[in-house]
Swiss-Prot record:
Subcellular location: Cytoplasm
InterPro entries documented for this protein: CynR_PBP2 (IPR037403), HTH-type_LysR_regulators (IPR050950), LysR_subst-bd (IPR005119), Tscrpt_reg_HTH_LysR (IPR000847), WH-like_DNA-bd_sf (IPR036388), WH_DNA-bd_sf (IPR036390)
One GO molecular-function entry: DNA binding
Organism in which the protein naturally occurs: Escherichia coli O157:H7
The gene coding this protein: cynR
Keyword Cytoplasm attached: yes
The entry's keywords: Activator, Cytoplasm, DNA-binding, Repressor, Transcription, Transcription regulation
Sequence similarity: Belongs to the LysR transcriptional regulatory family.
NCBIfam families: PRK11242.1 (NF008416)
A Pfam family per the record: HTH_1
Domain HTH lysR-type: 1-58
Protein name per Swiss-Prot or TrEMBL: HTH-type transcriptional regulator CynR
Gene3D superfamilies, per the entry: 3.40.190.290, Winged helix-like DNA-binding domain superfamily/Winged helix DNA-binding domain (1.10.10.10)
Length: 299
């Protein structure tokens, strides 16, 4: 049995069709069907029920699918381990982050990592925490950066920093000279907030409801860069991590009293899985970068 057989089996199981699976795999349907028959013969059981218009996994197929998926993950990890070089002269690293981190944290971190290890190929994606956790468990990512708590027990969360939400305004805003702003002032502020699909917005809404706050949300945006540009050009304000303001000219982060929301940023990785030298180096640099972010916030 070859890894090709496993890969073909999982593709047919996922697509529910030999035709669609063959197209996704870029092989002919007869060749795919032949490989599946060889696999079934080697296992001694039919894996697919072909009696109807659509194909379905048999009971044996359902059971074997779990093991096949894990086997393919382990084979992939083994291949990466073989090519892993301890001196970090080459290798690859697959990273995903939730959106707020692209505005202040991940840029400097990736730049520093590339400067130190130019032979490492980096793949960076921005996505929801739910998707990050799912892809980590499927071994389609090496590391993720998101927030505690973690929802899947297969994952390990390493604390990086505590992120505070602040009132972010332009330098010309009337409140820019304030050292802090009372939470009750949010009733009077006209806000630009991230749209509902962002975890940050969900957390803000939940906290405001719990605290009896009813801020005036006059603009919603599905892009952090759009929010920041609107803040720069208007007298509106927003609620975002305080560290974002330190990375963008013309903005001021004003602490809220009492604090609106604090959350712990974490680096996520799969438990008990092979950690490449690149992944270990990335964790080390992330912790260094977080220490610098903490120092900047305290100034």
């Amino acid at each position: 049995m070859l890894s090709r057989h496993i890969n073909y089996f999982l593709a047919v199981a996922e697509h529910g069709s030999f035709t669609r699976a063959a197209s996704a795999l870029h092989v002919s349907q007869p060749a795919l069907s032949q490989q599946i028959r060889q696999l079934e013969e080697s296992l001694g059981v039919p894996l697919f029920d072909r009696s109807g218009r659509t194909i379905h996994l048999t009971d044996a197929g359902e059971v074997w699918r779990q093991y096949a998926s894990r086997a393919l993950q382990e084979l992939g990890a083994g291949k990466r381990a073989i090519h892993d070089v301890a001196d970090l002269t080459r290798g690859s690293l697959r990273i995903a982050v939730t959106p707020t981190f692209t505005s202040y944290f991940i840029g400097p971190l990736m730049a520093d990592f590339y400067a130190r290890y130019p032979g490492i190929t980096l793949q960076l994606q921005e996505m929801s925490q739910e998707k990050i956790e799912d892809l980590l468990c499927r071994d389609e990512l090496d590391v993720g950066i998101a927030f505690a708590p973690v929802h899947l027990p297969e994952l390990e969360a390493i604390p990086l920093l505590t992120e505070s939400l602040a009132l972010v305004v332009a330098q010309h805003h009337p409140l820019a000279a304030c050292e802090q702003v009372a939470l009750s002032r949010l009733h009077d502020e006209k806000l630009v907030l991230l749209s509902a699909e962002f975890a940050t917005r969900e957390q803000i809404d939940h906290y405001c409801e719990k605290a009896g706050l009813h801020p005036q949300v006059v603009i919603e945006a599905n892009s952090i860069s759009a929010v920041l540009e609107l803040i720069r050009r208007t007298s509106l304000s927003t609620l975002l991590p305080a560290a974002i303001a330190t990375q963008h000219d013309g903005l001021k982060a004003i602490p809220l009293a009492p604090p609106l929301l604090e959350r712990t940023a974490v680096l996520l990785r799969r438990k008990n899985s092979w950690q490449t030298a690149a992944a270990k180096a990335f964790l080390h640099m992330a912790l260094e970068e977080c220490a610098d972010v903490g120092e900047n916030e305290s100034r």
